[in-house]
Swiss-Prot record:
Organism: Methanococcus vannielii (strain ATCC 35089 / DSM 1224 / JCM 13029 / OCM 148 / SB)
Function: Catalyzes the transfer of the phosphoribosyl group of 5-phosphorylribose-1-pyrophosphate (PRPP) to anthranilate to yield N-(5'-phosphoribosyl)-anthranilate (PRA).
Protein name as annotated: Anthranilate phosphoribosyltransferase
Binding sites annotated in the UniProt record for anthranilate 2: R157
Pathway: Amino-acid biosynthesis; L-tryptophan biosynthesis; L-tryptophan from chorismate: step 2/5
Gene Ontology MF terms in the entry: anthranilate phosphoribosyltransferase activity; magnesium ion binding
PANTHER family: ANTHRANILATE PHOSPHORIBOSYLTRANSFERASE
Length: 321
């Protein structure tokens, strides 16, 4: 298959699935060659899907029932608060959430970094995750604990220092096989491709693949692109006005501790720019999870959950599980 990639020929879903499994047994130099050739050619939806399905199939097994995930690819180079973590905690007030996450790669506040800064502990195994979701509606699935098969590939990725298909795979490889998903991508060109790949992996009923003018979140200060999948695909542009919100600037964030503090400020009812940023994305997540029928309703119930103290109480439950 390496020759095929070098000749810039696309792989099928089945070939991509097979290639992922081959890479687990390959030498480091051949892993690097495959990943570089695939990246140089340009990755397709079938290739992303084949890799993602194989990654799920090689993951530690976990069954949490019907869950939602709020996960982004990261890699947008922005210094923002960790919005997806905030959204996942709000969402857990209404439905089961299995948040697939990792430490920071490019941002100042990866989801696992912020999760720990909030005072929550990393769950060690599927049994602990099941207890957490039963007690709180929330489980944080720390990616390295569920994808041990990747131990050989990860050092090669680090050594290469280029983007590879693995920069896209994280949100598509949740071992809990989420039925609902809001998935951030770091480039608008990826939204349709990743939505298509997610549909091919299977198991998802409804998903929003989002990009906020370069952010892997919806942008509170301009237009964002969404590709919605619910058995069929629809791509459209939205602005904060569609959520009943005013345009607000994004305040940079310098550390996981700062991100955690600012999330708690919002959960405590503080009215500021971060609140709008979080409400916009929470409204979309509630819509993606089929809890509400439109974005406006999603924002309203997210507001009510925050202002009633429900979200702060949910965070305390998660910390004490």
């Amino acid at each position: 298959m390496l020759n095929k990639l070098v000749e810039c020929e696309n792989l099928t879903f089945e070939e991509s699935y097979e290639l992922f499994n081959m890479l687990l047994e390959e030498s480091e130099i051949r892993i690097a060659a495959y990943l570089t050739a695939l990246q140089t050619k340009g990755v397709t939806a079938d290739e992303i899907a084949g890799f993602a399905k194989a990654m799920r199939d090689n993951a530690v097994k976990i069954d949490l029932g019907e869950v939602t995930d709020t996960c982004g690819t990261g890699g947008d180079g922005s210094k923002t608060i960790n919005v997806s973590t905030a959204v996942s905690i709000i969402l857990a007030c209404f439905t089961k959430v299995a948040k697939h996450g990792n430490v920071s790669v490019t941002s100042k506040s990866g989801s696992a970094n912020v999760y720990e800064a909030l005072g929550c502990k990393i769950l060690e195994n599927p049994d602990e995750a099941k207890v957490s979701i039963e007690k709180t509606n929330f489980a944080f699935l720390f990616a390295p604990k569920y994808h041990p098969a990747l131990k050989k590939i990860m050092p090669v990725r680090s050594e290469l220092k280029i983007k590879t298909v693995f920069n896209i795979l994280g949100p598509l490889a949740n071992p809990a096989n989420p039925k609902y998903q809001i998935l951030g991508v770091n480039s608008p060109e990826l939204s349709e491709k990743v939505a298509n790949a997610l549909s091919k992996v299977g198991g998802v009923k409804k998903a929003l693949v989002i990009n906020g003018n370069g952010l892997d979140e919806l942008n509170p200060n301009g237009a964002s692109k969404i590709t919605e999948y619910n058995g069929k695909f629809e791509t459209y542009e939205i602005t904060p006005e569609d959520f009943g919100l005013e345009n607000t600037k994004i305040i940079p964030c310098e550390s996981p501790n700062e991100s955690a503090r600012r999330l708690i400020d919002v959960f405590s009812g503080k009215i500021n720019e971060d609140r709008n940023f979080i409400l916009m994305n929470a409204g979309a997540a509630l819509y993606a999870s089929e809890i509400v029928s439109d974005f406006l309703e999603g924002v309203e119930i997210a507001k009510n959950a925050i202002d009633s103290g429900k979200v702060l109480k949910k965070l305390e439950m998660i910390k004490n599980v």
